[in-house]
Each structure stands twice: as C-alpha cells, then as structure tokens.
Curated annotation (Swiss-Prot):
Pfam family, one: FAD_binding_9
Family affiliation: Belongs to the SIP oxidoreductase family.
GO molecular function: FAD binding; ferric-chelate reductase (NADPH) activity; flavin adenine dinucleotide binding
Catalytic reaction annotation: 2 a Fe(II)-siderophore + NADP(+) + H(+) = 2 a Fe(III)-siderophore + NADPH
Compartments, as annotated in UniProt: Cytoplasm
Phenotype of null mutants: Inactivation leads to ferrous iron chelator resistance as the wild-type.
GO biological process: cellular response to iron ion starvation; cellular response to nickel ion; iron import into cell; siderophore transport; siderophore-dependent iron import into cell
GO cellular component, one term: cytosol
Keywords, ordered alphabetically: Cytoplasm, FAD, Flavoprotein, NADP, Oxidoreductase
Gene behind this protein: yqjH
EC code(s) of this entry: 1.16.1.9
Protein name: NADPH-dependent ferric-chelate reductase
Length: 254
C-alpha cells in the first residue's frame, strides 16, 4: 500500500489579458451580483483551482485601457496611470464558453459599484489566473472558513464536491454581516455549513471546538488579512501538516 501523503499541486498558466464582453447580469442572491462574460478572447482560458483568482481591470470614464506586454522577462506596462483592479474568483463554464464573476455587493467598492452598473455589451479586461493550486477532491475531511469574500470560491468547491459519487465530510464556517447572504449557498445539500456572526472571536471559538482528524484532511481559511493570520495560528501546531492547510488573505481592512 502506498502511504505517501497526497498534497495539493501547483500548476502554472500562460498569463493573458483578455478583453471580454458582458453577456448577462444576474442577481443570483440577496448579496451577490453575477456578471457573465464571453467573447473570442476567452479561447484557451483555464482555471483548475477552486480558489483561483483572476485580476479584473475596471474601465474608467474617457479612458481606454491599453494592456501591458507579457514578455519572458515579465510584464511591461505602458506609460500612464493604470485602471483600478481587483482579484476575483473565476467561475468558468467550459460547455457554454462563458466566464462568470460573482460580486459581493457592498458600499464603497470600485468592483461592487461597477457590477451594479454593468450592462450587456460592456467591456471588461480580465487577466489570469496565472497559476492554480489543484486540491485533491477526495480528502476524507475538509474544513472551509471564510467570510463573504470567499463565498464564491467555497461555492465553486462545494458544487464540484457535490458531484462526487462518495462525498467527503465537509464542514464550513461562514461569517457574514447579513444573514440574507445565506441564500447564495442554499442550493448545496449534504454539507455542514455553519453561519456565524462577522466576528473573529466567534469564529476562533468555534474552531477551538472542532475535532480535526489526524490524517487525510484539508483546511482552507480566507477572509480579511489579519483575521486569516490570527485564525490560522492554531493550525501551525506540529500535529498539522502545513501542506494541507491553506490560509490566504482575500482583502485587507484599511
């Protein structure tokens, strides 16, 4: 029997900047607006990791975005100011040849503001994902911790796991400011999803109660940078394999 641990694997993608067209705008949840993109530039798009991120470049009034040149030495940007950009989880439908981005709607965000105003025919430049972390789907136990910013990646992962003949044991701790956001994951059955107040101490207290198996597990923690750092400390103990614990900041409080 091969007892070698199974670990997530990193893969690289060729970096391309794609100008895509808004095909549809859908309010898929009380808290999320979906923008569906398409176009010939989507040819060759690939995204193998459930928490991949693509960088979106938001158009500015009276300004035409000129993408940089990608060379073997790196990215060469043209002179002048760059448009604002944000990282988002790509939800790619290979059969329909469409790329969906789910935006958490909140006040004051350049991305949220654009998503609320977007109309079919609008243009959006999308870069990446530059690389993917391919996480095995069949870990016996899987723990996911996130706030609203990580919910699209969590949704993508759970939709994939739901298609397995044998589902793994999954626990998800999702902290939200508004319980109306829960409908974003309402269609996913067979998983233990716990909804918590948007409070670091509440999440940490719940983590302290959880029993993580000694092997064959995967742990994923995302959210605000300092919160992720603090929550992930308990998984730095020697009984946890760092290659099966993924902690990533999705945003930073100002």
């Amino acid at each position: 029997m091969n007892n070698t641990p199974r670990y997530p694997q990193r893969v690289r993608n060729d970096l391309r900047f794609r100008e895509l067209t808004v095909l549809r705008v859908e309010r898929i949840s009380a808290g999320f607006q979906r923008i569906v993109l398409g176009g010939e530039a989507l040819d060759g798009f690939t995204s193998r990791g459930f928490d991949d991120h693509s960088k979106l470049f938001f158009p500015q009034p009276d300004a035409h975005f000129v993408p940089p040149t990608v060379t073997e030495e790196g990215i060469v940007w043209p002179e002048g100011p760059r448009p604002p950009s944000r990282d988002y989880t790509p939800l790619y439908d290979e059969l329909r040849h469409e790329l969906a981005i789910d935006f958490f709607i909140h006040d004051g965000g350049v991305a949220s503001g654009w998503a609320m105003q977007a109309q079919p025919g609008d243009k959006l430049t999308v870069a990446g994902p530059r690389g993917s972390l391919v996480v095995p789907e069949d870990y016996a136990y899987q723990l996911y911790v996130c706030d609203e910013s990580g919910m699209p990646a969590l949704r993508r992962r759970l939709e994939t796991l739901s298609k397995l003949a044998v589902k793994p044991q999954v626990s998800a701790l999702v902290s939200v400011r508004d319980n109306a956001c829960q409908d974003y994951l309402a269609h996913l059955d067979g998983f233990n999803i716990e909804w918590l107040a948007h409070d670091e101490q509440a999440v940490d207290a719940r983590l302290a109660q959880m029993q993580i198996p000694a092997d064959d597990y995967f742990i994923w923690i995302t959210g605000e940078g300092k919160v992720v750092k603090n929550l992930s400390r308990r998984f730095e103990a020697e009984q946890y394999d760092p290659q099966r614990v993924r902690a990533a900041a999705y945003w930073h409080a100002k």
